[in-house]
Amino acid sequence: NSKFLDDINLIGIDDNLSNDKQIEIVNKNIKKENFNLLLIHKPSIWLKIRNNIDLMLSGHTHNGQIFPFNLFVRLQFKFKYNLYNYNNSNLYVSSGSGPWGPKMRLGTFNEVILFNLSPKE
């Protein structure tokens, strides 16, 4: 679940695990001396692991996907869509490139994000 790429520690977590198990795996794979990049479907554990993660990439909410359900997504999820920052930790929640359920979107958009990571100077 963890891959070391030069100075980047890439951690991927299975979505079918409990939050506690996901947190346990993240904490086992953190490398303090490296840039820790976490790929995980649901953004819900970020509050519990953000002090150890430099960048976390998530999705799950599809940014609502279909009106009026996007109104419920805004009420239910703290991290719905966007870039969030806390100290030196960043979370990006994407609206994703595909749908869940009906193959359509209404009132939101799909996206593919490109991140350029560069070393600290």
Residue ranges and their predicted role:
Residues 1-121:
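Soluble catalytic domains of enzymes that build or remodel membrane lipids, polysaccharides, and related
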